[in-house]
């Protein structure tokens, strides 16, 4: 299964915020959209960074409530790992596990933002694959038993 299969089923819409958005505003965006991370982008198509709930928690623990007034650019991850639509889901799962992150932006061939995949998306697609495999094996066993 490829990343393109995930994007096709969930859509390529990505919630972004400009780098000068304050952390308080970011929290509102996360809550409103019921998401765990947001791509930081000045134009909605280039990736300047990514900010997750974990980044916010770490910043709050380190700097206190004052961080809520800071721009997201102060707490975002600037070196964003990305993937392309043609990548295999297993590669993505391995990268997410190794890097210990739960969201990865998908980029087009020219590096423009083209979607985002979460670990939940990966788990959902793997469950679907396993169910199909289980059903195929069950059918095979039933056919062999008759």
Where are these regions (language model features)?
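Tandem CBS (Bateman) regulatory domains
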Residues: 1-13, 52-97, 119-146
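A glycine-centered beta-loop-beta connector
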Residues: 30-33, 38-55, 96, 104-122
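The conserved cystathionine-beta-synthase
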Residues: 16-34, 40-42, 64, 82-100, ...
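Short, charged helix-to-loop "capping" segments that act as catalytic/coupling loops
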Residues: 2-20, 40-47, 108, 144-146
């Amino acid at each position: 299964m490829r990343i393109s299969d995930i994007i096709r089923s969930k859509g390529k819409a990505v919630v972004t915020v400009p780098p000068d958005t304050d952390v308080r505003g970011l929290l509102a965006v996360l809550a409103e959209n019921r998401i765990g991370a947001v791509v930081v982008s000045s134009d909605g198509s280039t990736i300047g960074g990514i900010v997750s709930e974990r980044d916010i928690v770490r910043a709050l623990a380190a700097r206190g409530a004052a961080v809520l007034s800071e721009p997201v650019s102060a707490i975002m991850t600037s070196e964003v790992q990305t993937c392309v639509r043609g990548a295999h889901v297993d590669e993505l799962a391995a990268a997410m596990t190794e890097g210990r992150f739960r969201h990865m932006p998908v980029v087009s061939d020219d590096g423009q933002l083209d979607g985002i995949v979460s670990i939940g998306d990966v788990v959902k697609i793997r469950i679907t694959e396993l169910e199909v495999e289980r059903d195929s094996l069950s059918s095979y066993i039933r056919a062999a038993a008759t």
